Amino acid sequence: MNPKTGYVTLCYHYIRPDNDDPFPRILGTKKSEFENQIRMLKENFNIISFSDALSFSKDKNALDQNKSNVLITFDDGLSDHFLAAKILQKYKIKSIFFIPTCVLQDQLPANPIIIHYGIALFGLECFLTVLRDALKENDLEIEKYDIEYIPEKDNVWEKIDETKSIFKYKLDYNNSRKILLYIYQNLIHKDDPNILKKMHIVKPQVKEMIEMGHTIGAHTHTHISVAATELSKKDFLKEMIFPKKYFEE
């Protein structure tokens, strides 16, 4: 990258333990790999903060012109991010963490995180079984949304992608959330009542991250796919306007 053109953004999601991961099927960057990457970036690039990026949007000469600039961001308000924030603090790096407000206000997980943990903990077959129960409970046609999965025959990753597409493209906004919360409450939370803090960050950690100098950003309310979701005015305000006000207050 030509350093005079601006900056590159690196977006992280899961940062997982090196050993004894309680959720080994959650895919992500290992803690040691993450720290090695941060060390390498620190040595070879100019790592900017979110405020630096905002300054650049107003003044194109606001960034270092001698090195390539990198902004590090994190999506989804995951529990892993508190560890990441402490590693960044060790290297005097400030980042921005985008958090769905349902995690903090409602104390409920974001939509895709329910899918990740549900499949990682119980397998795709079990997840699809509870999905059918949820569809039936909400008077929705099982045949319209059902996915047939034969472990000995089908590619599991392709079937997982199909499963994700149900919630992203086929179910409407309200039904998608209702079905996912049914799966969370009747499968994931039922198995472990303390699972939410293992999935997502909590308010005291967010406060401490702000004290470290990190920035918190909105990531809609329930982590919807904005481009793929038709929203009423009320739902638009909830997903798009409320999160910004929540963090500002």
Describe the function of each predicted region.
Residues 78-79, 222:
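Short, glycine/acidic-enriched loop or turn micro-motifs at the edges of active sites
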Residues 1-8:
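Membrane-proximal basic amphipathic "stem/tether" segments
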Residues 73, 79-87:
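Membrane-embedded segments
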Residues 26-64, 92, 201, 207-211, ...:
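C-terminal domain-boundary segment and adjacent tail
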Residues 16-29, 228:
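Acidic/histidine-rich helix-loop elements
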Residues 10, 15-16, 67, 91-249:
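Metal-dependent polysaccharide deacetylase catalytic core of the NodB/CE4 family, i.e.
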Residues 73-74, 217:
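Generic enzyme active-site microenvironment
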